[in-house]
From Swiss-Prot:
It comes from Myxococcus xanthus (strain DK1622). CDD domains: CTPS_N, GATase1_CTP_Synthase. UTP binds at S17, K190, T191, K192, P193, T194, Q195, K226. The gene is pyrG. PROSITE patterns: GATASE_TYPE_1. This is CTP synthase. Homotetramer.
Length: 546
């Protein structure tokens, strides 16, 4: 009789960071979900910040926003894109959040005068957080951030070590990701870093049950046998995670090696045979699109670190999947647009996207990109700050308010067409205080937005402090700006568009957070469809996209 008690899969990493633990965890979740199991995923981050909301995109990359307003690690985006699990703030815990909870309990006297220590109080809080997020899942996949050996990770590793004894040996497995480097001078793949990484993990008290080795080449059976022997792991539980052209190929690759079957066997989980046809179809459209390619310009501030736009990049890829076309992303530094001009940097692209962001640097370049898209009739999509920059550009270029700006960038502008939300005026703290999470948006019948969504009211995720100033709403509409989406409760502007443009749309929310490869977001599907039409029009006019 196979057990139906909740199973826990703990994923750790060694040797170096950025091995792809998040993608490996998401792939495991996808495979087990395809076998009929209910899965959820949790990310444990060792840093002291309560959440990544106030961290620089250059340090942390994207901040992924959940439905309930959690500002979380970008790996939660992988989890949502690869599985049907809906993430919340309970799916991401940091050292800062854990320690804050422990200290608050101590202040309330919940420890009954005891000396508060890492063991058991901090580790108990970590375990409690894991159980809280587990809910009714058949399988809980817990990714521990950082690298084995990092001092910050020790409380988390101790907590997951204890979990095996708390919930039963048969209900826990440890999956360890390592690196198998190839030394060109020797012509060999070296296993020693993996051996030492496992040794470090065993010193903490964790014996990995599975090894997933990152590599850029095929690993022969003899090498896997060697790794198994030195690391005390069953040969059948040694797998490789090779370099793949698309991250969506990874579940198929791990299934080909039998990882999901082996996990089900070791954990004694009943599961059906996997159905991976839709993954295979996705890969076909990514690798062999039937309709060629389009070139999309992303005009932003963080273009030198594209991880800052991870969900955005993926959502554009999903739009390509929906239209069976390859999407080539052309990242353009908005400050360079200021210096060199939009005509020089954006000529020949099939569509232009201005994403969210913070700070004044490069904003005039974004406004110039909007102007170029509006005047040249190039498909345009503005997200969050991108919508605000579109309103500023329209106010300057169409309304004739040459000094129009956002109060975020010019506190003394005579025409603050974008202003601080009323609820934000008295806010002093930075962390977790923006308008965060899912809010309703009522769509204007007959608008492009209504046509794309096919709904009267939608729910989308937000992360902002500034909004279009309703004092200018009537003037903007009279001049031709269509306000196609509004928050029904506060009457905030949520979506804008231009009726006399092939595709000009802006949204105050972040639709990229809800896009999946199997369910591309309608705004991205429509945007790429418009880019295709622009490409074909350029070709007919003798213009060639680079």
């Amino acid at each position: 009789m196979r057990s139906k008690k909740t199973k826990f899969i703990f994923v750790t990493g060694g040797v170096v960071s950025s091995l792809g633990k998040g993608l490996a965890s998401a792939s495991i979740g996808a495979l087990l979900e395809n076998r009929g199991l209910a899965v959820t995923l949790i990310k444990l981050d060792p840093y002291i910040n309560v959440d990544p909301g106030t961290m620089s995109p250059f340090q942390h990359g994207e901040v992924f926003v959940t439905e309930d307003g959690g500002e979380t690690d970008m790996d939660l985006g992988h989890y949502e894109r690869f599985t049907n699990a809906r993430m919340s703030r309970l799916n991401n815990f940091t050292s800062g959040r854990i320690y804050h909870a422990v200290i608050m309990k101590e202040r309330r006297g919940e420890y009954l005068g005891k000396t508060v220590q890492v063991i058991p109080h901090v580790t108990d809080e970590i375990k409690s957080s894991i159980r809280q997020a587990a809910q009714d899942a058949d399988v809980v996949i817990v990714e521990v951030g950082g690298t084995v050996g990092d001092i910050e990770s020790l409380p988390f590793l101790e907590a997951i070590r204890q979990m095996r004894y708390d919930v039963g040996n048969e209900n826990v497995v440890y999956v360890h990701l390592t690196l198998l480097p190839y030394i060109g001078a020797a012509g060999e793949v070296k296993t020693k870093p993996t051996q030492h990484s496992v040794m470090k993990l065993r010193e903490i008290g964790i014996q990995p049950d599975f090894l997933v080795c990152r590599t850029d080449r095929e690993v022969p059976r003899e090498l896997k046998d060697k790794i198994a022997m030195f690391c005390n792991v069953d040969t059948r539980s040694v797998f490789t995670s090779p370099d793949v052209r698309s991250t969506y190929e990874l579940p198929l690759e791990l299934h080909r090696q039998g990882l999901d079957e082996r996990l089900a066997e070791v954990l004694n989980i009943w599961s059906r045979a996997p159905h991976l046809e839709r993954w295979e179809n996705i890969i076909r459209k990514v690798y062999e699109p039937a309709r060629g390619q389009v070139r999309i310009a992303i005009v932003g501030k963080y273009v030198n670190l594209t991880e800052s736009y991870k969900s955005l990049n993926e959502a554009l890829l999903h739009g390509g999947i929906a239209n069976d076309v390859k999407v080539n992303l052309h990242f353009v530094d908005s400050q360079e647009v200021e210096e060199q001009g939009a005509e020089k940097l954006l000529a020949g692209v099939d569509a232009i996207l201005v994403p969210g962001g913070f700070g004044v640097r490069g904003t005039e370049g974004k406004i110039a990109a909007v102007r170029y898209a509006r005047e040249k009739k190039v498909p345009f999509f503005g997200i969050c700050l991108g919508l605000q920059m579109a309103v500023v550009e329209f106010s300057r270029g169409v309304l004739g308010l040459s000094s129009a700006n956002s109060l975020e960038f010019n506190e003394h502008t005579p025409h603050p067409v974008v202003t601080l939300m009323e609820s934000q005026v008295k806010v002093q703290d930075k962390g977790g205080t923006m308008r965060l999470g899912s809010y309703a948006c009522a769509l204007k019948p007959g608008s492009l937005a209504h046509q794309l969504y096919g709904q009267d009211t939608i729910q989308e995720r937000h992360r902002h402090r500034y909004e279009v100033n309703n004092a200018y709403r009537s003037k903007l509409q009279e001049a031709g700006l269509v306000i196609s989406g509004s928050n029904p409760e506060l009457n905030l502007v949520e979506m804008i568009e231009l009726a006399d443009h092939p595709y000009f749309i802006g949204c105050q929310f972040h639709p990229e957070f809800k896009s999946k490869p199997f369910a591309p977001h309608p705004l991205f599907s429509g945007f790429i469809r418009a880019a295709l039409a622009q490409r074909d029009a350029n070709a007919a006019a003798g213009k060639v996209t680079e």
